[in-house]
Structures are given as C-alpha cells and as structure tokens.
Amino acid sequence: MDEICREIRRLTVECIGSVGVGHIGGSLSIAEVLKVLYFDKMKVDPANPKMEGRDRLIVSKGHAGPAVYAVLALRGFFPKDWLYTLNKPGTRLPSHCDMNKTPGVDMTAGSLGQGFSCAVGVAIASKIKKDKATIYSIIGDGESQEGQIWEAAMLAAQKKLNNLIAFTDRNMMQIDGYTEEVNGLGNLAAKWRAFGWFVQEVDG
C-alpha cells in the first residue's frame, strides 16, 4: 500500500476517533482516489485555495469528509491539528464537507445525490469560462440509489462534458447494510455506459 494512502487512513481514523462518531468505512474506502487526485493529478494551490482555473473535487458522498480533511491537511491546506476538532464547537471541519468553513473544499455536501449534480454544473460553467479545469466527483454506491445521480449523468453525457471525471466508490456498503440487499445496483459499469459514459473499472 502507498505510504501516503496509509497516512490518509491513519489520520482519518484519528480524526473520527477524536469525536467518537463518524462514517469510517465510507471514508477509508476513498483513500487511494484522494491520494492520486491531490498528490498526482489535480492543479491546486494550498496557499491559494480559491485559485482561478484550479481543478476541483466535489465529494458527493460528503459523509467521507474525514478522509478529505486528512488529505487536505497532508497537502498543507490547513494544520494537521485541525483534524482533532472534527464536529466540535467552533470547528472548521464539520462532519460533512462545507465550502464555507474548510479551505480546499469546493462544494458543501448536502443530501446524497446533490453533489454530483453540482459537479455537472461546475463542469458546464468551466466550459463556458474556457478555464481548462478538470472537475472530479466522488459518488457513493449507496448514493447511486438516488435518482438525481442518473439525471446528472444523463445531462453530462448530453453536454459532452469531457472535463468531468466521476468516481463511484463501489465498497458495497451503506448505512443500512450491504447495497445489494438494501436496493441492488447490479452492474454499475454497464449502467454508466448505458448513460453514454466512458467507463473504467479500477481495483482499489
């Protein structure tokens, strides 16, 4: 396992442990994606989080906030000791991502399904501005039971948003149990292809 991924997971566990409650599984399962984006791919500047033309990550499964905070701290967006204030009075790190509180967060997480729609809108705006940014979004597999995900996927394909990359975190779990027992998703890759997306399946 990559050492940075290991550190993201360690800090995530410590972050959640500091408050004693949180979505630990859904946070740990996106460590590799976060590492690749923030350390290898995304054009961002921790010293200037609102930099024009930056790449953006919109975490639609906002309950994975602790992992996002861990990678942001590692990249220098804010001090690591902020991690131990998760969801406490006066914190800048609420349990779900909040763009008005946390440096480096580009969209506030709300009801499941909404974040990806926001990502589609941001990608459209980026095209209009011609700023050459890439917009990334992380979607939960349980979240994919929301119809709004598929409305957004359909629109993105219609608009030919080649500046938008979506990751579905297929960890097979949601708050009420296994995804396939709660509301089976079947072959998610086939569903995305049917909506006009180019799909790659990655282990890890």
Stretch-by-stretch model annotation:
Residues 5-21, 169-171:
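N-terminal capping segment at the start of a domain
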Residues 12-15, 27-158:
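Cofactor-binding active-site loop characterized by glycine-rich and histidine/acidic residues
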Residues 20-28:
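Structural motif
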Residues 100-104, 171-173, 190-195:
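Gly-rich Lys/Arg/Thr-decorated short loops/hinges at beta-loop-alpha junctions or inter-strand turns
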Residues 131-132, 180-204:
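Conserved thiamine diphosphate
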Residues 134, 162-165, 198:
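Residues at the starts of beta-strands that form the adenosine-phosphate
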Residues 158-184:
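A short, conserved beta-to-alpha structural element at the edge of catalytic cores
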